[in-house]
């Protein structure tokens, strides 16, 4: 009997080819997926490092920028040799001590009533107001005036209301407070003594600590970065550089500036401290988080990461050479000009 139709089946060769093609497609998709995961992970690590570095930079820079805002010419002129007085009290290779109202209320006058020195002020709200704020500095076009007695602030939608019953200076007795301190006048809180310090021993650490100038019990730490090689830390800071831009003038009034780093554990002299017009700092931040690269590594082939590369820089001092490709390295730097401190300097030389 003759069959009405015929059927075909895969030959062994066709079956092997189809299996091979299927495996190749799966492998390609797996490789694509694996590469995308690695790229995303590397990008996430880089973003995390950048965020951490920028937070450290911004916190330090903002505290330095306000140096001298609450200070007088007399504060500037005192001898800072002992490291316990003055606006800038210590300027070394890896340590910097200075006064700044950063962390205190920084706000403005909304309105005022009464006659000087007994004034009632409505101020713009500030997140820094708290029960520990017992002195404020009110600034006008002539100078600034520190309260000798003031009430605890009361809060409303209109702002913070404080009452003063005296200032430590000012000869405006009897004048209307609104004419002495018109709307928009700057108001600042008390100074804190800030200490920026980098140490590099068995590990490395960078700290920015503060202490209220009038009350040593009010203190804390704003930046506390530390690395211990004996523990599974993901981040380290093997290099930190701190420099000071110093302006010097001769008797004819000709001035020049230059960046200075007091190396070898030394510090700036009192005259050099009084000539500071800017501070710059930077660091190299390493991350070994999720790094799995292994291989032969020649130290001479490792890249260098330089914090500052201007003509006055010495390469070995300002640069860090990567020790292993198992780390992701990032460089952070910032220049901060001390406008308020320089204003005091200019007053001293008039």
Task: Show which residues each predicted segment covers.
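Short, glycine/small-hydrophobic-rich surface segments
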Residues: 42, 46, 64-95, 255, ...
